Every structure is written in structure tokens, then in C-alpha cells.
């Protein structure tokens, strides 16, 4: 099928035409091959290299005998004898025959006068047109050269061009009948005037056949012009015609300023010569000097517009029944333009409208056609722009359709139809006439470089041109390349009252496509009975229901005299809609053809002539136990015209007539519905059900009959599904058929016939089965082969007031790590009257990693003691402090972690306190597992950054593979009486990251982690830090943290309980002696300094007389004597004592001898005698 690209509409003002064109394409059915006969195309071939087919024209002569001709121009045909040239071109006439090489050259240009002319490469046949049946023909040679002063120094050559007008029998008679036309001959020479006129590049006749119109695009420095000449000389109505001729620049004035084409930028003064002379007359081509140039607003800005490159005419363009002329200027203003001209009384063509192209170098105006597409009495304009292109949309070539709005062209927005890239779509246009006899003219558009070439046929209509082509002729089908370079239509050459189409090419071949007569068929279908009552069997056996069908056909055609006998093959298809849904038809035809299926019946009717009505009949019966009682049985009638087989046609045989064809714009199918008598649907016999999905939610399957709803997201509408090894998931569904308004129960809620639930599953879920809590409610569910679509039968019918709850079991095997959401689409369906909308149930999918992490420290209590020692003095780990070992265990109960991403086991190690002093010094980090069989992990960064010597016993144990020895647990003494700070002032502290300690993170990658991994970390307390900073602390808690991190591209990965905390308590060793690390000489100096201060103090006191004893008289000095109380009297003394000894009594007591001492009691007071005085002691 040919690709038919289409452009958008250009500008918004023409909204009426935009809408009407769309409606025309919408309501008229498509037709890829309509009534141009491709199989019976007539080919004609010319001389190789002659460009046979460059121009074509259909012609029909009436005198002296009727004959149809295919006129083909070959502008590179070899010269005739006597033409004094190699290639001159020519016009060929081909009869309507099956012979491909029976064309002959029309004798119109013999001989040559080389002193006045040159016919070498004159391109005779560059254009050819016919007036129609019994009319004249014009053909031109636009490169015909007129010469003067041949072989002299002042020789001139002017490419003026010329045309020939032939009689209807292809003969040239006197000038009154036709003859040779050279209007540029004898005019001013040079390419700025008429020296390169190129008359005949385009030529045509006016539709009333009174005028001959020429285009001369080389006039006035290729600005171009158009000329209208009277061609009806000698006719009886000559007196009623204007004399003419008429010319765009004025036939008498010859003023290029009167030519209205837009300007372009071909500027400057140009001299082209091959003569070394200062004589300006010897310049072959020149532009005017600035002083001699024409004055006016345009000047020579209007050069090179090529006005007259295409030409046409028509009535009703500007005013009703007034003839106007249209000329194309494809290079005007670099975009192209089209000018509508009218003739005035002064032999001039006056411009009335100038239509400009929209794109640079599009060639707008390269081709033209004038016709009334919508039959409104106003001629419309079709313009080709074959060089148009849209790079992004891949479009090439365009045709603009201007629909005439009562002679007003200012606000018309044209319809633009585009072709394929580089197709030259629009290089040729032709008005075909009424090709299908629908009352509207049609057009053809050539695209010679779309593949081997194509011709697009567009029909007219009351709404304008139909933008979708009714037929596409392809050069490949007839074996012609560059097919469609030239076109000619609008004339019936085979006598069947339908216009035909002649297509030329650049491949020296042309082809005629004859139009096939169009038949308009009428058909009727009669059904008995019109409604099916399943309770009333009427078949012959008395058990089943039968239906009689009668079909009748007739046809009409244009013209009414065309009345062939035709055969129509028809086919009846029963229960079409059900069959198209993939269901078994409910009908069986009792009479059917050998090749018919059970639900089909075919036949043939013969229509002998127009209006002949012929009928056929058949019977079908319904199947037993019909379930679908609400949907009508659709019977589809399709028919087609039986085409006689094409026999092999040999040259010399008489040209066969073309077979008729059915109207492609008339549907050839008809549908008829046969309804059932409806029961149980209320008094109005209309079943208005009210099926509703009351509940639909995802569930986890606990057991075969027990389900639990999944938790919901925050929105309350989306479930959360954790992908953790669940092979199945449930979908709970509850469907009801209850009245929507209990106060009006008859309004709806009727029985739902063929009630179904249609389930569409995503690619990640597959249907597995159905469960119901009540086996009676369990529906029948069937799925397709891929288990992605499920149909559940809810009942036929599902009764009023019914409710059913069931669970769909869905397999989760298709859920992958990339699955983030589950969406199941649900749609209730019934053939009862109810509008039902689809419903979606969704669930977010997340992958929960079943990882667990735990840790333990050995020992869990540590003590610090010893002496303060600097970092630089440390040599071995044993000098640091007590050893501690941390063991972190990670377990994985799910799939291997490397399928989900990369994981790391991290331990946050508090190695320093806030001021930067060492806290817990890491010695060694080892990872077992998580790396594959027999591999140990490498963690970073490396511990033991001070490179301290490792305990030799530990190294030896690791080399022998022996386990760590279990150290006895250390006990904390409860007594803290020796602590230098009182118990009330002691406090507890916690050293943790990142508040009170600085941490280093040891990260260990876990590769191929599928079971368990253990991380061992050995460290030692830094005694010096604790002795210096935490002597006043009652207890210290050192926290080590560990966690797991996973890096993955999976967005829905969830990791829970992936961290742990390992505390260790630290105390000051109560049995340790704190020895200050002070040098001995400092102590010695301190002792000496103390002695010196003491000596100075004694000397000072001595000088002050502190050590001199005061001397008093004996009478004034009290004497104290110690009295010894016998032991046996002491108890009596204590019993008689009535009070405490007063301080005044310690002054009257005297010591009894120099060697006597008072007795000290247990509380270090003197022991008293019976008299209350201290008891002296004896030696």
C-alpha cells in the first residue's frame, strides 16, 4: 500500500474549510483502488532517450471519422530529414490498442532555413494540450531559436520558442485554422526583452475554446509573461469575440513594470559576452545600465520570477461567468507566486490577485489546475509546489487547494497536502472530470520520484477535496519508472461515459488508465421472526428455534443506458459479534455452501440489467441451551461483484471493454440485529442491573481457606506487599447486585445476565486459582495461556440481591527486584443495561532483607591501672592496658546479597576522646565469611596505626589456629573508701560516638553473602588516658556500634534491624597503687626545700623568743600531781561520781611525780580516780 503523508492546515482563518475537509475525509469510507483500471492499463513506448512521455494529452477527433488518440510529447526525439539538426523533438499520436509501439510521429515541422532559424534542441513537444472532443491541439517548442545575420560578425540568436495549433485530425492547415505561433518574433532582442522568450513552456486553451493561452517565462530577463490569443478565427461567432491579443506586460506597451510578480534578489549589472568589442550592440546578453533601467518601485527586483511557467484559465474565479487567466511564477520572491489575471479593453492582462508561496525554493506555482471541486459555481484553484520539504516531518512536495469563497481570495486559508521526501509531489496536476460520476470533479497529482513514481487520485465533494486519496496508481504496477511526470485527464476516450487518465514519465513510456463504470447496489434484508422467543420452538423437529432470512439486490449506474448483466456474490455471517469476541456462535445455517462454515451461508444472484431486483433466502437455527439470552444475534451481509477472469490479451486484438466496479463510497456490508424476548427484567423488559465491587483488596495467604489483608499505605488505598519468599498472594473480591436506592428497588438491581468479572494482571503476577469460603459461591474462572487475563463467570444471570465473595490466588513468581508496584485492573461486565467502569487495585512492593546483626564484647568489664605513659614510649600492645575483643555476627536468611547490591559491615570504634587522647586502641580486625568459601575479608582502614608489637602469645595462637583463651572475669571491689573523691561526688559517664568520643569506622565489604559472617575486632584500653582524665569517675560505659549498609539501584529495598550496640563497662582497678610518675630528683629537691623552710621558721621563732619559758613564783604557779587510784577503788569512784569533770577541775589537779602519766581511756582521755582526778600511772 502506498504511503500517503499529509500536511497540516496552514493558517487559522479558513476554519470552515478545515472542518469541512476533515468531515469529508471522515464520513467517506476509504478506497485504496477505485475505478481506474490498473490491470487493463494500456502502455505506449517511444524511442529510447527521446523523453517520450514528457508531456501527454487525451484527444478525440470527430471528423472525418471518430477516433481517440493518446498524444505524447517527446522533446528529445531525433530530427526529421531536412531539419538540419540532430534532435528536435516531436509530437506522437498513439491509437487505443493493445500494441505498445504503434505510435506515429505527427508531421508538423518539416525542413529548416538555417539562415533564419535553428531547430537543434528546440524541444518540440515540451507541452501539448487538446481542446477536447472535436477540438484543436497545441504543442510547443520553447527552445526554438530565431537567427539573424548568420555567420556574420553581428549574428544574433534569440530563443523565442514557438507553438503549433493542429486541427482535430492532427493536421496543420492555414493560419485561420491554426498553424505556427511566434509572438516574440520581431520584438526587441536581448534577454532583458524578448530575446529569450521561451514561448510555449506552458500552453493551454480556455475552457470555452475561444482563446489560446501561452506562457513565456523567459521574457524580460526571465521575469516572464502570459499572452492570450484568439484561436476561433473563421468561426461563426467571431463577431462576438474581442480581437485581442492580450499580454501581461501589454501587447502594445510591452512594459515589464505591468507584470505583477513579486520581487526576488537576483540583482546587479550583468554582462555576458564572447566578443572582444566595445560595441554594445555586439553584447549577446546584458542588463540595462543603471541610467536606462525602468523606474518604479519594482525595478529589476522582479527578474527571474518565471511568470508563465504554468498556465490555466477558468470561469468563476473572480466573478461569476467571467473568464479569468491564471499564471504561475515558481521563482517569484524565491518562494513562488500565482497571479489571477483578467483582460481589459486595451489588450492588456490586468492582475487581480497574487497568491504567494510560504516556503523558500518550494516552487509554488510550478503546476496549476482550475476546477470547481464542490460544485458551488465558483472555480477553485489547485497549485503545485514540488520542491516543498519538511525535514523533521519527512515530507516532500506539496499541493495547495484554494477553495473559492465567492470570488474573494484575501482571507482564504489553503489546504496543503504533502508527499513523501524527494518525491516531487505536485510536479504535475490534472483535472480528471467526474471520475466516479458522483457529481463532483476529481483531480490527480503526480509524484514521479516516490519509488518508481505514483499518481494520487483525490475526489471532490460538497465539502471540498477529500484529503485521503481514493486511489493511488503506482509505476511499479505497470513497470514504469518516474511514473507521473505528466498527466492528462477529463476526456472519455473509450466511449463508456467515464473520463480516463493518461500518465507520462521520463522513461520513454506512457500509460492509459481507463475508468470503470460504477454500480450503485441496493440491498434489503427481511427477518422472520423479528424477535426470538426461546419458549416457542418453530423448527421442523419441534425442539429448536429457527429464523428465516431473505435478501434482495438491485443496482443503478451512470449513464442509464449502461445496463450490463452482473453477478453479485454474497455471504451471510451469523452471530458476528460473538464470533469476533472469540466465542462460539449460537446459530447454524441449514443451507450453506461447500466451503461455508457452520455459521455462514453464501450464494449468488444475477442482475440482468439496471433496476432488476433478485432475492435469495436461507434459514438458521439456534443451538440448544443458549446462555446468552440478552445480546442480540447480529447477522452481517457482505457482497461483492464477480469479476470475469482476465484472458491473455495479444497485440492486434480488439480493445476489451473495462468491467464495472461497485461504488467504493457505498458500504458493501450490512448488519442486522435479531433480539431475544427478555424475561425477568421487569415490566419494561429492560434488565437494569447494578453490579458493584464492594470489596477488593490484596491479602496474604495463611492457609488454603484463611487470608489476612495486607497492611495499607498512609493513603489508605494502596496495600504494602513485602517480597520475602511469599509464593502466592490473594485478591479478595466481593461483588453484589443490589438496588442502588432501597426506596426505589425497581429502578435497577435486575438480574445481571452473563455477569462476569474481567481481571487484567500485570506481568509480575500470574493467575493460579480461585478460592471461596462457601463452595456454592465459588465462580468459574478461566485464564488465557499466559495467565495474564482472567474471566470469572459470576452467574447467568446473577440474581437480584445476590452477593458473592471469593479470592483469586495469584502467583508472585514473576515479581523481580525491579518490581515496585502491582496493579490489577478489574472490570465487571454484563449484557444487561448498566454502564460499568474499570477499577484498579494497587500494592506497593518492597524487598525486605532478612538480615540480623548482633555483637558481644569479651570481657564486658575492664579495669585500668598502672602508670601514665606517653604515646611515644609505647612499644608493645601489652603496655597500653587491658585487652578487649568484640565479635559482631551478621546472618542472612534470604537470597545471596550480591543479587541485590553491595553490602558493607561497619563498626564505629571509639578510638579517641574529645581532646584527641587515645581511648580504645584498635589492634586487629578480621572478617570471617561473606567473601565466598575459604576467603577472609579485608576491612578498611587498617588498625594498629602505631605499629605496636603484637603479643607474641596471640601471634603464636593465630599461627597454630588455636582459639582465644578465656580470661577469668574481673571483679569490682565494692569498697571505694580509698577513692580520692567522696562517693557523693563520683559520677557515671558514657563514651559514645559522636557526642563524647571520636570514632573511626571500619568498613568490611560482604561479597557473596548468603548465610553468615563474623567480624572480630581486638583492642586495648589506653590506661594513661583513663588515669589522667577519669580518676574522679565512678564508672565508664564505652559504646561500640555496628551496622550494615547496602548500596543498590533497587529503590524499594528495605533493611530493618541492621544495627547493634555493644557496651563495655570500665572501672579503676581498686587493688592498684597509684604511683605518680615523678622523677626522684624532684622528690629530693622537695624534701630539701621543706627542711630549709622548717629551719628558717624555727630560727625566726627562736629570735622572737618563742622557745623561752616564763618563770613564775611557786606560790602563783599551780601544781598538778597525779594520784594513783587502786584498782579495787576505781569502781566505787565511778559509782559515786555524779557529774562530768568540769574544765576548772583540769586546772587544780597536780602530777604526783615526774615519772607518773595519766591513764588514757579507750577514747584517749585521762582515766579518773575516785575523787574525780586523773589516776597517775606507775612505772
UniProtKB/Swiss-Prot annotation:
List the ranges whose topology is Extracellular: 34-1076
- Tell me which Gene3D superfamilies the record gives: Bicelle-embedded integrin alpha(iib) transmembrane segment (1.20.5.930), Integrin alpha, N-terminal (2.130.10.130), Integrin domains. Chain A, domain 2 (2.60.40.1460), ntegrin, alpha v. Chain A, domain 3 (2.60.40.1510), ntegrin, alpha v. Chain A, domain 4 (2.60.40.1530)
Spans through the membrane: 1077-1102
What the entry lists under SMART domains is as follows: Int_alpha
Stretches the record annotates as Disordered: 952-978, 1134-1153
Query: Where are the annotated sequence repeats, by residue?
Result: 1155-1158, 1163-1166, 1171-1174
Answer yes or no on keyword Signal.
yes
* Membrane topology value: Single-pass type I membrane protein
Q: List the disulfide bonds.
A: 94-103, 140-163, 184-197, 539-546, 552-615, 681-687, 781-792, 939-993, 999-1004
The name of this protein is Integrin alpha-7
Amino acid at each position: 500500500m502506498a504511503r500517503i503523508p499529509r500536511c497540516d492546515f496552514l493558517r487559522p482563518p479558513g476554519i470552515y474549510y478545515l472542518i469541512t475537509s476533515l468531515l469529508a475525509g471522515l464520513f467517506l469510507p476509504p478506497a485504496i483502488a477505485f475505478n481506474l483500471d490498473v490491470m487493463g492499463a494500456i502502455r505506449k513506448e517511444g524511442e529510447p532517450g527521446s523523453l517520450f512521455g514528457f508531456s501527454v494529452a487525451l484527444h478525440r477527433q470527430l471528423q472525418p471519422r471518430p477516433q481517440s488518440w493518446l498524444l505524447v510529447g517527446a522533446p528529445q526525439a531525433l530530427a526529421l530529414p531536412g531539419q538540419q539538426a540532430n534532435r528536435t523533438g516531436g509530437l506522437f499520436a498513439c491509437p487505443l490498442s493493445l500494441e505498445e509501439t504503434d505510435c506515429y510521429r505527427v508531421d508538423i515541422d518539416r525542413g529548416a532555413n538555417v539562415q533564419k532559424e535553428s531547430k537543434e534542441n528546440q524541444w518540440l513537444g515540451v507541452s501539448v494540450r487538446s481542446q477536447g472532443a472535436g477540438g484543436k491541439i497545441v504543442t510547443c517548442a520553447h527552445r526554438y531559436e530565431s537567427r539573424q545575420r548568420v555567420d556574420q560578425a553581428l549574428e544574433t540568436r534569440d530563443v523565442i520558442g514557438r507553438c503549433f495549433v493542429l486541427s482535430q485530425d492532427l493536421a496543420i492547415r492555414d493560419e485561420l485554422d491554426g498553424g505556427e505561433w511566434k509572438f516574440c518574433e520581431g520584438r526587441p532582442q536581448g534577454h532583458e526583452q524578448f530575446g529569450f522568450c521561451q514561448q510555449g513552456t506552458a500552453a493551454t486553451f480556455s475552457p470555452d475554446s475561444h482563446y489560446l493561452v501561452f506562457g513565456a517565462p523567459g521574457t524580460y530577463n526571465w521575469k516572464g509573461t502570459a499572452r492570450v490569443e484568439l484561436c476561433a478565427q473563421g468561426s461563426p461567432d467571431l463577431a462576438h469575440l474581442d480581437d485581442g491579443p492580450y499580454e501581461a506586460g501589454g501587447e502594445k506597451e510591452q512594459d515589464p513594470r505591468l507584470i505583477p510578480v513579486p520581487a526576488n534578489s537576483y540583482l546587479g549589472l550583468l554582462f555576458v559576452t564572447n566578443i572582444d568589442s566595445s560595441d554594445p550592440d555586439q553584447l549577446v546578453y546584458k542588463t540595462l545600465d543603471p541610467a536606462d533601467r525602468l523606474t518604479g518601485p519594482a525595478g529589476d527586483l522582479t527578474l527571474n520570477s518565471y511568470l508563465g511557467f504554468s498556465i490555466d484559465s477558468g470561469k468563476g474565479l473572480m466573478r461569476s461567468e467571467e473568464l479569468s487567466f491564471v499564471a504561475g511564477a515558481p521563482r517569484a520572491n524565491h518562494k513562488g507566486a500565482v497571479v489571477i489575471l483578467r483582460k481589459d479593453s486595451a489588450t492588456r492582462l490586468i492582475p487581480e490577485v497574487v497568491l504567494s508561496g510560504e516556503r523558500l525554493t518550494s516552487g509554488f506555482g510550478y503546476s496549476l489546475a482550475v476546477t470547481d471541486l464542490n460544485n458551488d459555481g465558483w472555480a477553485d484553484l489547485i497549485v503545485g509546489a514540488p520542491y516543498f520539504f519538511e525535514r523533521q516531518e519527512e515530507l516532500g512536495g506539496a499541493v495547495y487547494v484554494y477553495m473559492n469563497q465567492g470570488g474573494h481570495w484575501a482571507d482564504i486559508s489553503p489546504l496543503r497536502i504533502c508527499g513523501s521526501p524527494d518525491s516531487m509531489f505536485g510536479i504535475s496536476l490534472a483535472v480528471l472530470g467526474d471520475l466516479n460520476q458522483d457529481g463532483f470533479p476529481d483531480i490527480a497529482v503526480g509524484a514521479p520520484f516516490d519509488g518508481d513514481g505514483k499518481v494520487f487520485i483525490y475526489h471532490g465533494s460538497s465539502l471540498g477535496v477529500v484529503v485521503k486519496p481514493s486511489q493511488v496508481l503506482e509505476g511499479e504496477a505497470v513497470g514504469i519508472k518516474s511514473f507521473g511526470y505528466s498527466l492528462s485527464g477529463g476526456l472519455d476516450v473509450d466511449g463508456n461515459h467515464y473520463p480516463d487518465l493518461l500518465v507520462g514519465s521520463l522513461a520513454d513510456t506512457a500509460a492509459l488508465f481507463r475508468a470503470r463504470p460504477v454500480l450503485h447496489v441496493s440491498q434489503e434484508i427481511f427477518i422472520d421472526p423479528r424477535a426470538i422467543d426461546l419458549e416457542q420452538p418453530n423448527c421442523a423437529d419441534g425442539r429448536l428455534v429457527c429464523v428465516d432470512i431473505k435478501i434482495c439486490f438491485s443496482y443503478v449506474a451512470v449513464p442509464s443506458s449502461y445496463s450490463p448483466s452482473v453477478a453479485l456474490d454474497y455471504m451471510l455471517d451469523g452471530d458476528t459479534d460473538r464470533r469476533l469476541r472469540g466465542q462460539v456462535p449460537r446459530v447454524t445455517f441449514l443451507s450453506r455452501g461447500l466451503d461455508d462454515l457452520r455459521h455462514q451461508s453464501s450464494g449468488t444472484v444475477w442482475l440482468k440489467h439496471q433496476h432488476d431486483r433478485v432475492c435469495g433466502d436461507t434459514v438458521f437455527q439456534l443451538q440448544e441451551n443458549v446462555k446468552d439470552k440478552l445480546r442480540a444475534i447480529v447477522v452481517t451481509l457482505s457482497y461483492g461483484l464477480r469479476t470475469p477472469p482476465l484472458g491473455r490479451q495479444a497485440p492486434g486484438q480488439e480493445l476489451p471493454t473495462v468491467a464495472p466496479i461497485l461504488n467504493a463510497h457505498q458500504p458493501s456490508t450490512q448488519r442486522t440485529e435479531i433480539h431475544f424476548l427478555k424475561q425477568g427484567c421487569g415490566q419494561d423488559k429492560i434488565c437494569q442491573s447494578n453490579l458493584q465491587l464492594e470489596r477488593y483488596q490484596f491479602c496474604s495467604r495463611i492457609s488454603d481457606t484463611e487470608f489476612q489483608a495486607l497492611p495499607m499505605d498512609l493513603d489508605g488505598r494502596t496495600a504494602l506487599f513485602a517480597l520475602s519468599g511469599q509464593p502466592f498472594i490473594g485478591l479478595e473480591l466481593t461483588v453484589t447486585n443490589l438496588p442502588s436506592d432501597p426506596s426505589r428497588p425497581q429502578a435497577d438491581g435486575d438480574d445481571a445476565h452473563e455477569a462476569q468479572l474481567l481481571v487484567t494482571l500485570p506481568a509480575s503476577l500470574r493467575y493460579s486459582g480461585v478460592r471461596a469460603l462457601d463452595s456454592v459461591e465459588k465462580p468459574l474462572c478461566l485464564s488465557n495461556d499466559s495467565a495474564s487475563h482472567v474471566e470469572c463467570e459470576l452467574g447467568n444471570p446473577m440474581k437480584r440481591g445476590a452477593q458473592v465473595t471469593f479470592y483469586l490466588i495469584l502467583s508472585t513468581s514473576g515479581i523481580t527486584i525491579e518490581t515496585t508496584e502491582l496493579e490489577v485492573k478489574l472490570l465487571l461486565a454484563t449484557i444487561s443495561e448498566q454502564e460499568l467502569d474499570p477499577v484498579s487495585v494497587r500494592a506497593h512492593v518492597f524487598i525486605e532483607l532478612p538480615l540480623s546483626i548482633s555483637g558481644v564484647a569479651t570481657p564486658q568489664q575492664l579495669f585500668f591501672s598502672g602508670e601514665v605513659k606517653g604515646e611515644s614510649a609505647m612499644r608493645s600492645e601489652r603496655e597500653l592496658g587491658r585487652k578487649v575483643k568484640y565479635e559482631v555476627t551478621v546472618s542472612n536468611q534470604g537470597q545471596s546479597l550480591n543479587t541485590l547490591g553491595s553490602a558493607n559491615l561497619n563498626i564505629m570504634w571509639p578510638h579517641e576522646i574529645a581532646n584527641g587522647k587515645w581511648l580504645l586502641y584498635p589492634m586487629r580486625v578480621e572478617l570471617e565469611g561473606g567473601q565466598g568459601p575459604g576467603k577472609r575479608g579485608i576491612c578498611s582502614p587498617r588498625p594498629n596505626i602505631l605499629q605496636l608489637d603484637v603479643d607474641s602469645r596471640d601471634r603464636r595462637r593465630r599461627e597454630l589456629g588455636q582459639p582465644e583463651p578465656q580470661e577469668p572475669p574481673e571483679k569490682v571491689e565494692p569498697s571505694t573508701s580509698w577513692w580520692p573523691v567522696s562517693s557523693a561526688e563520683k559520677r557515671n559517664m558514657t563514651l559514645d560516638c559522636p557526642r563524647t568520643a571520636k570514632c573511626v569506622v571500619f568498613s568490611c565489604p560482604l561479597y557473596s553473602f548468603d548465610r553468615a559472617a563474623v567480624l572480630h575486632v581486638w583492642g586495648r584500653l589506653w590506661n594513661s588516658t583513663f588515669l589522667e582524665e577519669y580518676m574522679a569517675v565512678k564508672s565508664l560505659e564505652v559504646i561500640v556500634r555496628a551496622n550494615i549498609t547496602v548500596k543498590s539501584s533497587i529503590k524499594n529495598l528495605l533493611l530493618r534491624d541492621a544495627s547493634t550496640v555493644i557496651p563495655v563497662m570500665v572501672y579503676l582497678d581498686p587493688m592498684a597503687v597509684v604511683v605518680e610518675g615523678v622523677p626522684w630528683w624532684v622528690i629530693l629537691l622537695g624534701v630539701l626545700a621543706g627542711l630549709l623552710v622548717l629551719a628558717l621558721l624555727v630560727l625566726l621563732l627562736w629570735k622572737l623568743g618563742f622557745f623561752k619559758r616564763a618563770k613564775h613564783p611557786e606560790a602563783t604557779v599551780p601544781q598538778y600531781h597525779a594520784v594513783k587510784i587502786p584498782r579495787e577503788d576505781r569502781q566505787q569512784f565511778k559509782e559515786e561520781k555524779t557529774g562530768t569533770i568540769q574544765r576548772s577541775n583540769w586546772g587544780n589537779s597536780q602530777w604526783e611525780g615526774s615519772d607518773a602519766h595519766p591513764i588514757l581511756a579507750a577514747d584517749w582521755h585521762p582515766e579518773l580516780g575516785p575523787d574525780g582526778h586523773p589516776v597517775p600511772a606507775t612505772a
